[in-house]
């Protein structure tokens, strides 16, 4: 029985919603698309079958930090045959891995890495048990994080003799689902879509003129562990420095070294830190069940990203909170990035049309490489469509903030779902913050006279 294997390899007695059906489908050699809400344990859907079949499990992942988190999680469980094959490995280590592929059970690669001819050639020589495409929405030009390299994975699959393929994502509209199926999966693929509604998470938006005061107010009322999301690394450090004197807090962003990130994850998981101020680089691959709240200090750029980030709260099923702090003109930083992106794209178009040789920015150089690989007109059209989409996503995010009806209904409708009865719903439905014990503050050393007075007060 699958439950026996689950207990043997992971120490769990029961599956979460959707896990067993997806695993059974994969073990029956059926291509499978699993759309599971954040926090539902998507990684188990390939890890458990990986132990039950012969051969290597290849996992395509878009982010180095996500790969490292997944490998670290497997290693903590005692699995030594997992490795992230990416640019962080030096040349000698990469050569060693390629020459000893049969030693590994779980091999994590970026889409850019697996399409390299030398890598593909080596993979063709070994038995591939399963091809897993994590964050599969990246394959769609209508997805939040379109990555053109994902479009090449269909050809990669053919080269690897079409192993059974599992596509995983937490957010997919009907259009994104259709694109995933077309590029990655066989026509008879099984699709398992589960509601992204997290009924135990209350949804709150506060429109404020003083975010720091609002943040302090919430932290004084909330208990348990929490994440505070900010949009930039500098803002993360600024907010962290305001909180560090009073709370057990750390900060996390993509600029930290790999060992620093691992240490922070460990401290947060073990409750040595109760708060983490972070960019959205933090959260993917995090298995902490008892995060009681997620606060967005800055405005997210899309409902898709917002949904994924708040989904890191309350994975144990207990009441939790998602709080978004909004100050007038918060959207300006997103408009700025959108304008900057468009100007760089237009400048590159002019350079191409006029066949001029001019120095390019790092971003333009990256785009130029994509134009060589995928065709100039295709790539420029993709960039234009991406600009339009980001504008639309931001408008939807702003509409959510100003919405006066049920926020949960608004969020679910965006993903094509109908609202369900929800006793702990949102601020517009009149609920109040569900708090636990207050956050522990840092203990300051008191003067001996103050300590003595406190002792006498306590006795009396």
Region locations from a protein language model:
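Helicase motor core with emphasis on the C-terminal RecA-like subdomain
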Residues: 2-9, 13-45, 49-55, 60, ...
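C-terminal helicase lobe
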Residues: 223-229, 233-236, 247-250, 254-257, ...
């Amino acid at each position: 029985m699958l439950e026996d294997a689950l207990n043997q390899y992971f120490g769990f007695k029961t599956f979460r919603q959707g896990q067993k059906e997806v695993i059974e489908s994969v073990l029956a050699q059926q291509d499978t698309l699993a759309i599971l809400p954040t926090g539902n344990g998507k990684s188990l859907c390939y890890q458990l079958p990986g132990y039950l079949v012969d051969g290597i499990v290849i996992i395509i992942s878009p982010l180095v930090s996500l790969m490292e988190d997944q490998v670290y999680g497997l290693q903590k469980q005692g699995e030594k045959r997992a490795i992230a094959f990416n640019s962080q490995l030096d040349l000698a280590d990469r050569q060693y891995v390629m020459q000893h592929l049969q030693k590994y059970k779980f091999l994590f690669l970026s889409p850019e890495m697996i399409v390299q001819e030398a890598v593909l050639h080596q993979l063709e020589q070994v038995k591939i048990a399963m091809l897993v495409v994590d964050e599969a929405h990246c394959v769609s030009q209508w997805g939040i994080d379109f990555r053109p390299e994902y479009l090449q994975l269909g050809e990669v699959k053919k080269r690897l003799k079409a192993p059974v393929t599992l596509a995983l994502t937490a957010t997919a509209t009907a259009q994104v689902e259709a694109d995933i199926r077309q590029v990655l999966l066989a026509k008879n693929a099984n699709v398992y879509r589960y509601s992204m509604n997290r009924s135990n998470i209350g949804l709150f938006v506060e429109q404020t003129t003083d975010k720091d005061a609002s943040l302090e107010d919430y932290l004084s009322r909330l208990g348990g562990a929490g994440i505070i999301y900010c949009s930039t690394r500098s803002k993360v450090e600024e907010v962290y420095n305001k909180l560090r004197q009073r709370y057990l807090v750390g900060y996390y962003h993509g600029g930290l070294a790999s060992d620093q990130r691992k240490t922070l994850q460990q401290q947060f998981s073990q409750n040595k830190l109760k708060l983490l101020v972070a960019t959205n680089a933090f959260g993917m691959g995090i298995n902490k069940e008892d995060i009681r709240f997620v606060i967005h200090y800055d405005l997210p750029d899309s409902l898709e990203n917002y949904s994924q980030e708040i989904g890191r709260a309350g994975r144990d099923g207990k009441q939790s909170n998602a709080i978004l702090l909004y100050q007038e003109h918060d959207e300006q930083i997103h408009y700025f990035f959108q304008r900057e992106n468009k100007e760089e794209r237009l400048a590159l178009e002019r350079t191409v049309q006029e066949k001029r040789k001019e120095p390019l920015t790092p971003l333009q150089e990256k785009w130029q490489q994509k134009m060589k690989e995928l065709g100039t007109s295709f790539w420029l059209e993709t960039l234009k469509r991406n600009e339009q989409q980001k504008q639309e996503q931001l408008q939807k995010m702003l509409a959510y903030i100003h919405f006066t009806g049920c926020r949960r209904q608004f969020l679910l409708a965006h993903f094509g779902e109908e609202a369900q009865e929800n006793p702990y719903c949102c601020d517009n439905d009149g609920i109040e913050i569900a708090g636990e014990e207050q956050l522990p503050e840092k203990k300051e050393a008191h003067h001996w006279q103050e300590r003595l007075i406190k002792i006498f007060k306590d006795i009396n």
